């Protein structure tokens, strides 16, 4: 069974900023291909989202947040998400943030669900 994937408003803002940054610094076709891959990775969370590890930030946040990595080397981005289970094999995945691996992780106040 597939999970439903929702993208939080802050994650949409993150994605817009990332897309703008990559478009400014890369050829258009390369940027589009990379961004399409990012969206595909987010979409892959429909199936077995618990395959992704619990983020180290979960302890500080006091709730489970998982992490999916996209890209490689210096182009790696962290996709932070939570899982709301309706049953063990069904529920909602909520993408909370997307950050470059070298940036400071989002703080507790940034993980508030909207």
Segments (PLM) and residue ranges:
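Basic, Lys/Arg-enriched alpha-helical interface segments
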Residues: 1-66, 87, 112
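Enriched for short, Lys/Arg-rich terminal
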Residues: 70-114
């Amino acid at each position: 069974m597939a999970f439903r994937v929702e993208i939080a408003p802050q994650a949409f803002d993150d994605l817009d900023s990332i897309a703008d940054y990559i478009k400014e610094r890369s050829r258009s076709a390369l940027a589009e291909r990379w961004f399409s891959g990012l969206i595909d990775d987010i979409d892959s969370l429909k199936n077995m989202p618990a395959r992704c590890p619990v983020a180290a930030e979960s302890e500080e946040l006091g709730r489970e947040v998982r992490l999916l990595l996209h890209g490689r080397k210096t182009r790696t981005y962290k996709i932070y998400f939570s899982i709301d289970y309706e049953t063990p094999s069904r529920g909602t995945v909520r993408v909370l943030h997307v950050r470059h691996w070298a940036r400071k992780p989002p703080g507790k106040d940034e993980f508030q669900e909207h």
